[in-house]
Amino acid sequence: LIQDGHVDGKNIHIFEGMKILGGSNDGAGSIKDGFVCRGGRMLNEETYENFWELFDRIPSLDHPGQSVTKEILDFDHLHPTEARARLIDRHGKILDVKSMGFDNNDRLTLGKLMITPESKLDDITIEQWFKDAPHFFTTNFWYMWQTTFAFQKWSSVFELKRYMNRMIFEFPRIETLAGVTRTPYNQFESVILPIKKYLDSHHVNFVTNATVTDIDFKDDDTITVKALYLNKDGKDEKIILNDNDICIMTNACMTDSATLGDYKTPAPKPVEKPISGELWYKVAQKKPNLGNPEPFFGNIKETNWESITVTFKGNKFLKIIEEFSTNIPGSGALMTFKDS
């Protein structure tokens, strides 16, 4: 908007329901209290063209005169990823994963998926697609692809196809994750903070702890927004949009319903409904062709997942992992205990 659309930054307003910016990239904390990273993005040099083009325009916070893109790629090239303990069995043995483990039926079923139009894949799970090829779920490929991109058997085969198309470069190197592009720090500090500072310098208005609770549309066949309903710090507010205003909505977030536990207490079941999901339900009822949030928010057991961020005061654990995997810290990407 600022660079290509020449929009004055002071006319851009970003409403965030949380107290911190970054969405799923909100890794934050302190040495004293520990860190929490609710999510992370697996970057890839070959296929994230829009990301690299954008951040090639954003200055690095640590290296004056250098872009965030160059900072990340330089760091990654100096610290390449090469997992040496990608899959581990129930006996603690590192498995040989040079072979994908496919049989011919697996190959045919996967190949058929790649050439099937997306219009024929609605409401089909991965398990349903491979119902006549159950061996697929015992292959090294499934265990590695599943844990790299957070798939389950009940996930959408539509999404699996899209990941296969988009991440096809990772197919021949999935056993080492050599294609994973690492950021120097966690992605909140390496990605969110630089772009936040850049937008601040252009006087973009960030409003945190502000939940958009509903949207009014024009009474025609467009999806033109005429009003936003906001709850800011517990107070309701209505914002009227002008005819030439642009409204961009985030209709869902993977970490929207996240709750936190601690060393002694499990994360509790969410009490509040997901803010982006609730908004999506409302707008989908008002206008056609805005998607269906039910599969994403109506199947709690299937869409629930747990993530643990560990903050150590020493390096003993890192040394144990390094000795076991032969990877120095940061170079091994993922270790999957396939029978856990």
Task: State where each predicted segment sits.
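Conserved FAD-binding subdomain of flavin-dependent enzymes
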Residues: 32-74
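Helical element adjacent to the flavin cofactor pocket in flavoenzyme catalytic cores
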Residues: 165-246, 251, 270, 277
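Glycine-rich FAD pyrophosphate-binding loop
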Residues: 2-30
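Amphipathic alpha-helical segments that form well-ordered structural scaffolds
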Residues: 50-57, 144, 190-201
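Extended hydrophobic secondary-structure segments that form protein cores and membrane-embedded regions
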Residues: 11-19, 71-74, 247-249
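Rossmann-like flavin
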Residues: 61-166
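Glycine-rich loop(s) and the adjacent beta-strand/alpha-helix scaffold that form part
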Residues: 231-330
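Short catalytic/ligand-binding loop motif for oxyanion handling, primarily in non-cytosolic enzymes
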Residues: 22-24, 81, 216-217, 255-259
